[in-house]
């Protein structure tokens, strides 16, 4: 996936990577991920193994509209679910696993993954989560760093919108995104610093690798980072979405934010930015409270409810999107506010039925919608 960079938000290309759990009908993790990748990889472009054997990652090609992205995401999910069904397994679209497991997830055999397990020890046993990563084309790395400085302020709102992991290991965590809390255990994870230049970005990456906090550039787990293999900026804050429609909506929001940032740079607009420690604190709040929380608004420079900030976010990103994407964004946000985020839908199903098995059933049905 290598979305090409262009100059306006409506023309920006976008691609999405999604991680999924493989589970049996009871919701327990399956170690068959590498086998499913081997069997289905020739039919499903972009299928990849992950750190844990219970996970699989998909990647779209280059897309330009929300509708195009939705169709490709839905097709990838359906084909992968069919491949999993060939082994009597299900695709679980949740940021965290739901039921109690007896042992930590098994690591996929590979020299890199085995070295990660040795280097980071028990952290590796406790960070098995599934996320959604959105790539948007940018003109250059210098511009990408400046875009990151603007986009980072919106990370709490993005996290609240994308939250889909309220349950883990058999209980309600009291968070909307427990995945965010788990993932934060990596020493290289968190909001990106505010950088003055691409040179400063590269120096910081080198220093983190030098300390051992990251083994290599692929382990720079900032929530916004510059991709190394394609000319894109990558936003990594989201839980994997319950539905393809929600994943596509989130990707359009990210695309629109990058377009807004590029236009803001052209216009000389400055946006107040939070220090990393304050942004980290606001991300914790967003992970806990979801859309019911509040944080400092980049658009208003004061604390506002996140639901109100969704309106401000829409005001920022919509002008840079084409007509079809504006309609896709408006419809998608209306649906989320009416039906709930993934986390809200998971909790509602548990409240209605009273079992995590019912939540697993909901997730494995909705994954292909």
Swiss-Prot record:
It is an enzyme of class 6 (ligase). It comes from Rhodococcus jostii (strain RHA1). Keywords: ATP-binding, Ligase, Nucleotide-binding. It comes from the Bacteria. The lineage of its organism: Bacteria, Bacillati, Actinomycetota, Actinomycetes, Mycobacteriales. Belongs to the glutamate--cysteine ligase type 2 family. YbdK subfamily. InterPro entries: GCL_type2/YbdK_subfam, GCS2, Gln_synth/guanido_kin_cat_dom, YbdK. It catalyses: L-cysteine + L-glutamate + ATP = gamma-L-glutamyl-L-cysteine + ADP + phosphate + H(+). Its EC number is 6.3.2.2. This is Putative glutamate--cysteine ligase 2-1.
